[in-house]
From Swiss-Prot:
Gene from which the chain derives: dbp8
Name used for this protein in its record: ATP-dependent RNA helicase dbp8
Segments of this protein annotated with the region Disordered: 1-52
Start and end residues of each Helicase ATP-binding domain: 124-303
Catalytic activity: ATP + H2O = ADP + phosphate + H(+)
Organism: Aspergillus clavatus (strain ATCC 1007 / CBS 513.65 / DSM 816 / NCTC 3887 / NRRL 1 / QM 1276 / 107)
Its biological purpose: ATP-binding RNA helicase involved in 40S ribosomal subunit biogenesis and is required for the normal formation of 18S rRNAs through pre-rRNA processing at A0, A1 and A2 sites. Required for vegetative growth.
Entry's Gene Ontology BP terms: rRNA processing
Length: 523
């Protein structure tokens, strides 16, 4: 039988699957005995949009900048769209009230997850009732549990073959979901498998052929298996009953670097949409994702359930997040970053520094090491084993600073992070939402600092218009970043560190100064 055309595949699948979520993934350590909190209740209060900021505000700080201003007609914002229409009640304050199985309630309690968040209250009952779902909620609000709990409960009723498939855009997020699935399903001895790039395909093919219960994968690597590993390896996918697109906005986006062709290949190996549930979750519900609700559906399929928690403004950030900007000259950005990380208020904070390019991230890590910062990195130039090791070091506080590209901006849940620095201003406001969502998670406080140069003002204005709040100018009592850069010899110190780091890269050495053999990169 000829495989369905790409447009038929994605249309058939997504009409049933409408949803998305940059889910915040609870932090689960690789060490099984020490189970960490997966999620805590999130504050889903409404954040009113502010009027479009002006260029003069960026040039000169104003006291009124940080104050959000409510728009007319939004005095009674709808926090749960469609959820209230089906009778969602506030008294559903426990997982038992959501009809979650006792063994799952016990497992969540063991992991210190006792009360469902708003996205979990809205989605879990509807998914258990067999509906396709589109779920939108801010970062850190518990979207992973919102789809994993009903998947595990329905699997336990019919634990035969590959029951669920979870697709996610990054390897690190896939690993985090995989570890979380293992932790929650521990009482039932579920057999999940992780399929991502950067590791041996042969061992993955054997794992797929062994009929695991849940497959957590990145689209590119799973598509490679579907194309090249043989029918015997991937035939189990034809029994999938539930598919999840986590970070659906990224998976379904078009343009350069699009994952859509690989997603279509993955969906073509699954049963038709009329024979399975499709769940889409994201922190940024795009119009394209939202429109999937109204696509044609099979006669036997109930309507798609759509809920957007506190998403009435296009992309929301946690209300406990303090958003700031710091004006920096183009030629001294590294010096300003070094001083910012060394101030009395920031010198002990676990921090993530986001860059737009892998080469920038590599250079910054090497430079900051020479400036005595405890730093590691996460980007696509690193082999997968090193990426995993670096992330583990940061989680364990062996490194205080993680320098990363947007590969670390989606889904990763590291509760200790209290500072996010945008070294490069993201070109897409949605990327900003995901970046700053690495802090201030699950009701905790956090701060983001965006380094703004002369050419970045319009990008900052677009970000502020998107999140509905204005950034404050960064300040710390008794601290002048510019003064410290100019008067304390920082420029010379940082300049020397940058030159040494650049030379190390040119010589082909790793961050520890060891000569590195150029090996063929494993996909």
């Amino acid at each position: 039988m000829a495989p369905p055309r790409p447009e038929e595949t994605i249309s058939e699948d997504l009409d049933e699957s409408s949803g998305s979520s940059e889910t915040e993934q609870p932090d689960i350590q690789t060490r099984a005995p020490k189970r960490r909190r997966l999620s805590a209740s999130s504050d889903d209060s409404y954040v009113a949009p502010a009027p479009l900021p002006t260029l003069s505000r960026i040039k000169k700080k104003g006291a009124e900048d940080a104050k959000p201003v409510a728009s007319a007609g939004q005095e009674n914002p709808v926090l749960i769209r469609d959820a209230l229409e089906i009778g969602l009640r506030e008294e559903a304050s426990s997982f038992s009230a959501l009809n979650v199985a006792p063994w799952l309630v016990g497992s969540l309690t063991t992991l210190a997850v006792r009360k469902p968040t708003a996205i979990q209250k809205a989605c879990i009952p509807e998914i258990l009732n067999g509906k396709d779902c589109i779920g939108g909620s801010r970062t850190g609000s518990g979207k992973t549990i919102a789809f994993s709990v009903p998947m595990l409960q329905k699997w336990a009723e019919d634990p035969l073959g590959i029951f669920g498939l979870i697709l996610t855009p990054t390897r690190e997020l896939a690993l985090q979901i995989f570890e979380q699935i293992k932790a929650i399903s521990a009482p039932q001895s579920m057999k999940p498998v992780l399929i991502t790039g950067g590791t041996d395909m042969r061992s993955q093919a054997l794992a797929l052929a062994g009929r695991p219960h849940v497959v957590v994968a990145t689209p590119g690597r799973l598509a490679d298996h579907i194309k090249s590993s043989g029918e015997d390896t991937v035939c189990g996918l034809k029994r999938v009953r539930m598919v999840v697109l986590d970070e659906a906005d990224r998976l379904l986006s078009s343009g350069p670097g699009s994952m859509l062709p690989d997603v279509e290949t993955c969906l073509s190996a699954l049963p038709p949409s009329s024979e399975r549930q499709t769940l889409l979750f994201t922190a940024t519900v795009t119009p394209e994702v939202r429109a999937l609700k109204n696509m044609p559906r099979a006669a036997n399929k109930p309507p798609v359930f759509v809920t957007e928690i506190s998403s009435e403004s296009q992309g929301t950030v946690p209300p406990t997040l303090k958003q700031t900007y710091l004006k920096v000259p183009l030629t001294h950005r590294e010096a300003f970053l070094h001083v910012l990380l060394s101030t009395e208020g920031n010198s002990t904070k676990p921090a993530i520094i986001f860059c737009n390019h892998t080469k920038t991230a590599d250079l910054l890590e090497r430079m900051l090491r020479r400036l005595s910062h405890r730093v590691t990195s996460l980007h696509s130039l690193l082999p997968q084993s090193e990426r995993n090791a670096n992330l583990a070091r940061f989680r364990a506080s062996a490194a205080r600073i993680l320098v990363a590209t947007d590969v670390a901006s989606r889904g990763l849940d590291i509760p200790s992070v209290s500072l996010v620095v945008n070294y490069d201003v993201p070109r897409n406001p949605d990327d900003y939402v995901h970046r700053v969502g690495r802090t201030a998670r699950a009701g905790r406080s956090g701060e983001s600092v965006t380094l703004v140069g002369q050419r970045d003002v319009q990008l900052v204005l677009a970000i502020e218009a998107r999140v509905g709040r204005q950034m404050e100018e960064w300040s710390e009592e008794g601290v002048s970043i510019e003064g410290r850069v100019v008067r304390t010899g920082v420029l010379k110190e940082v300049g020397e560190a940058k030159r040494e780091a650049s030379g190390e890269i040119d010589e082909g050495r790793d961050v520890l100064g060891r000569k590195r053999n150029k090996l063929k990169k494993v996909r």
